[in-house]
Amino acid sequence: MSKIAIVQFKASIDKTKNLPRILQYIKQAAKNHADLCAFPEYMMFFTPASQSAKQVAHQAEAINGKFVSAISECARQNSIIVVGTMLEKSKKKDRVYDTSFVVNKSGKIIGKYRKTHLYDALGFKESAKMLAGRIIPLPTKTSVGKLGMIMCYDLRFPELSRALASSGSEILIVPSAWVNGPMKEEHWLTLNKSRAIENGCYVIAPDHLGHIYSGRSLAIDPYGRILLDMKKRQGIGYVNISISVVRNTRKKLPLLKNRRTDLYSNFRL
């Protein structure tokens, strides 16, 4: 059994104000005996539409910069796994990567994922400020289970989650900044539950709160049961999970095993 802490909070546009809050959340989660603490997308800083691409890039950092280094050290001092997010510098002066990372209990970065599906939909255009990642990392092995990393809009593309589950993911971690709008919360609930059910895995989905975002951070079990729904509450939610539930679910309901991939060769997936 592992205890997961999910952080739901409203970030400032100033990363120097957000970092102390993030470190405090990590310490609080560790004090409450959590094994892993997961944060939402844009935890580093909120980027309003009025902010230019160059302004966003100016605040971005390398993965080994001060922001992630401080989080890594806090994880080490408190012996807790941290899944965080950042806006990562690229070679272009006006573009960043939307990146999630995994830090182990020793403070070492053991996983990194650059968001592959940018939110160019429903009036938004993330590609005006960001670059899409081009690699789907294999699941990250941790003491709580094998983590598959996706982010927010990625939820709408089931091939990504299926590829990770087929490669051994037991927990999908989905840091998000899910924008408000007609039917958007319904989509959020349905998509997270669907990814859990069809892959027989846990889904841990920390969501950003406030600004234009929905909140509703979730933890869902392999049968699609909602174990935690944080609604509009700012702070930390806790949930206990067991990887044996994933193994038993996949044994009783062997969706990955029963797939007929031999039938798909003539289709463009």
Predicted feature residues:
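Active-site-proximal beta-strand elements of phosphoester/diester hydrolases
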Residues: 1-13, 38, 99, 112, ...
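Short, acidic/polar
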Residues: 17-28, 157-162
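Short beta-strand scaffold segments in enzyme catalytic cores
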Residues: 84-86, 99-102, 138, 217-219, ...
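Active-site catalytic loop in hydrolytic enzyme cores
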Residues: 91-167, 180-190, 252-255
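CN hydrolase (nitrilase-like) catalytic-core segments centered on the catalytic cysteine
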Residues: 60-83, 146, 155-237
